[in-house]
């Protein structure tokens, strides 16, 4: 399985302290999304010579910066990861620096390529190329963040977002 060789203490920490933070975000960025990105990231990681513990942590932290707003969430997520002293039990300062960069680089709508393979893995996993899921999450995000829009404007916003992010 994907979690077979995962450090159990790290996994317990993420499950108890990090993933619950996603419960406060819109449905498109809730715990289900975080778990999907973790699973997809670990599945992709099997094809590369990478540290699976790092991939797991990067995926777990990738959207926690939404606590401070959407626009710079990728930067805030990196700051939150780097400031989490608990991670020093499992990772060196150099690994944490790479992880921070990967979290900062994960954003699919970013105008630059991720700096490392870790950023590329999580960015790709976060894209979630399943069309029905993409549309559902885009609609959920719109309803949660733009409640003033009527049905027609929600549809227009959805199409604009999908065109910008995936076209």
Question: Model-derived features: where do they sit?
Answer:
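Short, small-residue-biased leader/transition segments that mark boundaries at the very start
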Residues: 1-2
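An amphipathic alpha-helix signature
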Residues: 11-15, 38, 54, 78-82, ...
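Short alpha-helical hairpin
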Residues: 6-20
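An active-site-proximal "capping" alpha-helix that borders the catalytic cofactor pocket
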Residues: 37-41, 72-87
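Hydrophobic, well-structured mid-protein blocks that either form specific transmembrane helices
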Residues: 79-115
């Amino acid at each position: 399985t994907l979690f077979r060789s995962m450090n159990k203490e790290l996994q317990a920490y993420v499950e108890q302290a990090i993933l619950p933070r996603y419960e406060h975000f819109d449905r498109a960025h809730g715990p289900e999304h975080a778990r999907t990105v973790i699973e997809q990231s670990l599945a992709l990681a099997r094809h590369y010579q990478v540290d699976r513990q790092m991939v797991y942590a990067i995926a777990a932290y990738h959207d926690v910066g939404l606590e401070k707003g959407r626009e710079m969430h990728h930067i805030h997520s990196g700051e939150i990861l780097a400031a989490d002293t608990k991670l020093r039990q499992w990772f060196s300062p150099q690994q944490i620096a790479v992880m921070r960069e990967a979290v900062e680089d994960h954003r699919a709508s970013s105008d630059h390529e991720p700096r490392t393979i870790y950023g590329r893995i999580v960015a790709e996993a976060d894209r979630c190329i399943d069309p029905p899921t993409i549309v559902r999450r885009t609609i959920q995000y719109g309803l949660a963040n733009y409640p003033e829009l009527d049905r027609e404007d929600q549809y227009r916003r959805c199409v604009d977002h999908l065109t910008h992010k995936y076209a």
